[in-house]
Amino acid sequence: MPPINIEAARRIQERLARQVTYAPLPPVETVAGLDVAYSGSLAFGAAVVVKRTTLEVVETACSVSRIVVPYVPTFLAFRELTPMLRAYIKLKSKPDVILVDGHGVAHPRRFGIASHIGVVLKKPTIGVAKSRLYGEEVGDKLVDPATGEVLALIIKCGGKKYVSVGSYATLDEAAGLVAQLCKSGDVYPLRLAHELANKLKKAHLPDDKDRDSCP
């Protein structure tokens, strides 16, 4: 696996971060969760669309991709973008909002994986992370220590969830929507995507002909 070119990746993030858009969410009827699981040299992407009000599953899609980029902190998108997008583009029913297992603007360069996906797809995206990547916790907020800017809101859904804008959303609306989607101690669309990605990983065989089928 070739190493990532850190400086080139940093420049890409800094350039694309200027395209992050803060805007009110559209009317939200459906929400997708995106996640990735790993086994050996393969990445298993999952997308699960649910109805916002009932949490009923509308559609699922999966992908299997070869890992071509190692994990490097703050550059997660360069590893997970491909499996997530390959699953997402297979969805027939495109969701109103996308939740991503990772950060949005709560990132040193304001461009975590949720922002990357939002800019690429030009869709409302929200980052939901279980751990802090950048910033200082002040009450229920994650704040940039240099500027005082609020990067994320911290909600309790099981444990802490750090909710940040990916793109085409506002922070208050993003946190409010994620709180609505909390069920049984987790953000439900993301839990379903996590479970599906791991189920695909366990079911996958090296000689599978239909590699991308959800189990």
From Swiss-Prot:
Catalytic reaction(s) noted: Endonucleolytic cleavage at apurinic or apyrimidinic sites to products with a 5'-phosphate
EC number: 3.1.21.7
Chief place where the protein resides: cytoplasm
Molecular function via GO: deoxyribonuclease V activity; magnesium ion binding; RNA endonuclease activity, producing 5'-phosphomonoesters; single-stranded RNA binding
InterPro entries the record matches: Endonuclease-V (IPR007581)
Organism classification: Archaea, Thermoproteota, Thermoprotei, Thermoproteales, Thermoproteaceae
Site (Interaction with target DNA): 71
Stated role: DNA repair enzyme involved in the repair of deaminated bases. Selectively cleaves double-stranded DNA at the second phosphodiester bond 3' to a deoxyinosine leaving behind the intact lesion on the nicked DNA.
Protein name according to UniProt: Endonuclease V
Coiled coil ranges: none
Positions bound to Mg(2+): 35, 101
Annotated organism of origin: Pyrobaculum aerophilum (strain ATCC 51768 / DSM 7523 / JCM 9630 / CIP 104966 / NBRC 100827 / IM2)
